[in-house]
């Protein structure tokens, strides 16, 4: 069935709205408004751990969620008020659940939800309430939300996957538009800055692709493959192919802009890339509307105009760089062909082979592999372990403060610290500001609620609206979500018969204390800046690019042209590790005083590394053409030089300067020999591409050696 033309945020919030509305109706019918708080908190907990999956996968997730929530809620409830046993129980649960996140996204999500439920249990405690009431109501809320999400999945089974694929095309559209800036001849002198901008944009593409891959992975695990899921898989593969071709670099952009700045070809390519970016956005819009993408005839005329301009340019100019422009246009033509195929659903036959439609596993996948995933993380070099220890100490401190001072409603401190303390210093600092701002504003607005909503019914409507708005805003604006959840919390306290005005200053003070604990923890307990290992991230990036080049060389040698799961996984790792380098530098840039000596070589590494990934991707686009014109002598020598280049990249982090120079001299000799065997157009193109790749070796190695306190290590 067709998905209604509703905003994605509204669609994803419908299960929450339905759940809270049902809970409020039940509470109103029973005449027990004090049950609203634990009931709604259970719904919120269920929403926090909700992960898209096929129907049977969701049912398994619900069972695991209820089991974990039962354990954490009963543990918190049974030890609450006992002093040291409660502090120990909460601390151990925090460490255990957080370190479990090392297994994968699913376990990390469930573990955080279990910690949230334990905290919710402490928040809803009152001495006069039977001890099982609040844990039971929290679990009822979780089950109610789970039931609602199952119903909505039956009604709109493919909406989450469509939204994930649409987000991937939106991100890809932004990436294409960023790539278009490379073809602005008036900005040729500042192309180095464009590389950094493009790398940052690429991080968003990789994130969107990974979310899309995750959604498809869980939908494809069953034996039956729904036609709509298969269609989304084809769209995903098309996006991957477009990304590889657009991220490829066939020429030195600065040199090309200088040489062709007075011709119209540069401006035409710039316009074509912008139009292809818009085509990606149009694809995203079509997916969200459950319609087929309609290919724009203007796009076809634009690519034909580029080709005509190139023909006229080549007729009047014997510049050898013309052939590189021709290869660039051939690549853009392949992107255009992908859009044409999307309209006609022409990828069906190409991608329905089983070997082409597998997706690499996302995580270890089962509990039996849990220890194998956790064991390597049990050291301070692991960000997961540092976060687990840090968060455990924060929880212990918060619980100790509340228990020692016997603070009324004091567990808001624990809740704030738990949600604000992130593995990353920059993210935590941002959340501290947003949490405090959202809470203060929420308290101000919440103080007006009793004047305008004296009845139980209107207060329940406030709870419904604020909870729904919390979920609508939590993924993109944390201060807004904090604002809405503060209003919800104060209204729930009012429904429970507590003095809201007495709770308001407590809420603000507790938020400040909890946020301060989180900030102090990430600032002084194994702070991130001591472990922001630019060296390791750069090593992983260059090694994964070497593996990517090696995989392409194998394909060129064997003549294979398909993108099987192994090739896609290798390509994805190269892009992910390059994106990780971008993220690391972004974090370091927020603390320039601490990383002053590392930032300059870091940005050189990013610019060079991103160019390297682009040149390797371009070589990957030639996989089907190696044997068309190349002589056997050229082919053999090309494989030798390419394999040697890949080997140098893969072992670059551990190579000493003298050994690196020897290897580089040997490679240059191999490339000189290869040049003597280069005769046809195709061999010239392949030679030039390999030379562009090899050209990145020296600047990358030089920048890598300039990283302060560098120690030899093997990142491979």
Specify the residue positions occupied by each region the protein language model found:
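Long, hydrophobic alpha-helical segments that serve as membrane-spanning/inserting helices
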Residues: 1-14, 25, 29, 50-51, ...
């Amino acid at each position: 069935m067709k998905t209604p033309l509703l905003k994605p945020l509204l669609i994803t919030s419908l299960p929450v709205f339905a759940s809270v509305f049902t809970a409020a109706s039940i509470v109103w019918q029973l005449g027990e408004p004090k049950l609203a708080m634990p009931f709604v908190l259970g719904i919120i907990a269920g929403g926090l751990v909700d992960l898209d999956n096929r129907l049977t996968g969701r049912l398994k997730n619900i069972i695991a969620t209820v089991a974990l929530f039962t354990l954490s809620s009963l543990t918190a409830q049974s030890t609450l008020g006992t002093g040291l046993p409660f502090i120990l129980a909460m601390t151990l649960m925090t460490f255990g659940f957080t370190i479990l996140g090392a297994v994968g996204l699913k376990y990390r999500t469930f573990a955080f939800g279990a910690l949230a439920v334990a905290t919710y249990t402490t928040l809803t405690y009152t001495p006069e309430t039977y001890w099982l009431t609040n844990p039971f109501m929290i679990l009822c809320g979780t089950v109610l939300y789970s039931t609602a999400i199952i119903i909505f999945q039956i009604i709109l089974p493919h909406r989450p996957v469509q939204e994930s694929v649409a987000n991937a095309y939106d991100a890809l559209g932004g990436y294409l538009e960023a790539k278009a800036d490379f073809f602005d001849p008036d900005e040729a002198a500042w192309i180095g800055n464009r590389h950094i901008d493009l790398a940052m944009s690429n991080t968003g593409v990789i994130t969107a692709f990974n979310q899309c891959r995750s959604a498809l992975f869980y939908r494809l695990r069953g034996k039956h493959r729904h036609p709509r899921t298969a269609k989304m898989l084809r769209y995903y593969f098309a996006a991957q192919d477009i990304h590889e071709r657009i991220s490829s670099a066939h020429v030195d952009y600065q040199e090309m802009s200088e040489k062709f700045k007075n011709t119209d070809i540069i401006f035409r390519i710039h316009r074509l890339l912008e139009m292809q970016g818009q085509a990606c956005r149009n694809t995203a819009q079509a997916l969200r509307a459950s319609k087929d993408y309609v290919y724009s005839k203007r796009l076809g005329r634009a690519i034909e105009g580029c080709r005509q301009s190139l023909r006229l340019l080549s007729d009047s100019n014997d510049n050898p760089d013309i052939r590189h422009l021709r290869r660039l246009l051939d690549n853009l033509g392949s992107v255009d062909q992908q859009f044409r195929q999307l309209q006609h659903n022409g990828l069906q036959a190409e991608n329905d082979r089983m070997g082409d439609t597998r997706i690499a596993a996302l995580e270890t996948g089962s509990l039996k592999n849990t220890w194998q995933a956790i064991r390597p993380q049990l050291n301070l070099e692991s960000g997961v372990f540092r976060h687990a220890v840090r968060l455990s100490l924060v929880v212990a401190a918060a619980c100790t403060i509340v228990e020692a001072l016997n603070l009324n409603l004091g567990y808001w401190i624990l809740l704030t610290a738990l949600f604000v303390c992130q593995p990353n210093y920059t993210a935590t600092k941002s959340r501290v500001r947003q949490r405090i701002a959202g809470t203060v504003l929420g308290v101000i607005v919440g103080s007006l609620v009793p004047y305008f909503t004296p009845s139980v019914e209107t207060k329940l409507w406030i709870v419904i609206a604020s909870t729904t708005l919390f979920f609508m805003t939590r993924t993109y604006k944390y201060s807004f979500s904090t604002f809405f959840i503060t209003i919800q919390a104060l209204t729930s306290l009012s429904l429970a018969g507590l003095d809201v005005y007495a709770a308001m200053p407590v809420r603000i003070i507790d938020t400040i204390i909890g946020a301060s604990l989180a900030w102090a923890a990430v600032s002084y307990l194994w702070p991130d800046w001591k472990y922001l290992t630019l060296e390791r991230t750069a090593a992983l990036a260059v090694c994964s690019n070497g593996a990517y080049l090696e995989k392409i060389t194998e394909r060129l040698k064997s003549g294979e042209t398909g993108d099987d799961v192994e090739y896609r996984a290798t390509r994805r790792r190269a892009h992910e590790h390059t994106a990780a380098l971008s993220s690391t530098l972004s974090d370091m840039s927020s603390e320039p005083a601490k990383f002053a000596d590392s930032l300059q070589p870091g940005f050189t590494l990013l610019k060079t590394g991103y160019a390297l990934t682009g040149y390797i991707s371009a070589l990957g686009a030639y996989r089907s053409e190696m044997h068309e014109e190349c002589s056997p002598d050229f082919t053999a020598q090309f494989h030798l030089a390419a394999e040697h280049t890949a080997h140098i990249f893969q072992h670059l982090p551990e190579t000493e300067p003298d050994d690196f120079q020897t290897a580089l001299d040997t490679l240059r000799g191999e490339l000189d020999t290869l040049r003597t065997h280069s005769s046809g157009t195709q061999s010239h193109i392949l030679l030039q591409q390999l030379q562009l790749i090899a050209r990145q070796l020296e600047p990358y190695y030089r920048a890598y050696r300039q990283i302060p306190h560098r120690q030899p290590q093997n990142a491979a």
